[in-house]
């Protein structure tokens, strides 16, 4: 799925089932990871931060990988939810319909979980950049954290929309528990990072 920013926004606004919230969440997460990469690159090139240049170089490589992973999850979510839409389109009198829907729901729950997991890893890098990157770029670190937080929460809503309809409750509850653990771990940390940046900006002002 290769679109301009305008094209992606128009695709989201269209009266079509995909792309939807899951794909949008993946893209927002990719923006957060990309901001992390930018901060790390500036830091690695800054002579004043030469003592941590190796760490910063590793960080931007990791951030680039996460951004690419999240961009790929935009398309993966589209494909997965496309299977759900196709399954619901099977005639109701077809005995294969129920199984097809359930199989598709399970497939569609996986990209949102992977989006959440990638955003958690990006948030860990952003926390590191708050400590090791340039003070002048702390607001960019915080923006990245806010984006990854929003992406994680958005992806969780997409995941829950799928698990709610799953008949295999054991599988659904396992996914929901894993999702809740990510939310409980990372949302407060993202909020703390944003507050830290806001406080620092006000002190400089």
Cite the ranges covered by each PLM segment.
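Alpha-helical scaffold segments that form or flank carboxylate-/histidine-based iron centers
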Residues: 17, 58-65, 108, 140-145
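Amphipathic alpha-helical interface segments
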Residues: 77-146, 150, 162
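Preference for long, well-ordered alpha-helical segments
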Residues: 115, 122-125, 136-205
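Short, hydrophobic/aliphatic alpha-helical segments
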Residues: 1-19
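Transmembrane signal-anchor/signal-peptide helices with a preference for the extracytoplasmic
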Residues: 38-50
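Amphipathic, well-ordered alpha-helical segments in soluble domains
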Residues: 8, 31-38, 73, 80, ...
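A structural-propensity feature for long, helix-poor, extended segments
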Residues: 47-86
């Amino acid at each position: 799925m290769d679109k301009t920013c305008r094209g992606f926004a128009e695709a989201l606004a269209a009266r079509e089932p995909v792309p939807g919230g899951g794909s949008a969440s993946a893209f927002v997460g990719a923006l957060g990871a990309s901001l992390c990469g930018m901060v790390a690159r500036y830091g690695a090139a800054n002579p004043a931060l030469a003592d941590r240049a190796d760490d910063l170089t590793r960080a931007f490589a990791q951030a680039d990988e996460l951004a690419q992973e999240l961009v790929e999850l935009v398309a993966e979510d589209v494909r997965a939810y496309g299977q759900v839409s196709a399954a619901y389109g099977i005639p109701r009198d077809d005995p294969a319909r129920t199984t097809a829907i359930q199989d598709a729901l399970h497939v569609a729950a996986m990209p949102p979980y992977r989006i959440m997991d990638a955003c958690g890893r990006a948030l860990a890098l952003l926390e590191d950049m708050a400590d090791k990157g340039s003070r002048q770029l702390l607001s960019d670190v915080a923006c990245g954290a806010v984006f990854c937080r929003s992406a994680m929460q958005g992806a969780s809503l997409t995941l829950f929309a799928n698990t709610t309809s799953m008949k295999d409750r054991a599988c659904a509850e396992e996914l929901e528990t894993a999702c809740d653990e990510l939310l409980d771990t990372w949302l407060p940390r993202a909020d703390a990072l944003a507050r830290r940046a806001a406080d620092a900006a006000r002190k400089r002002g």
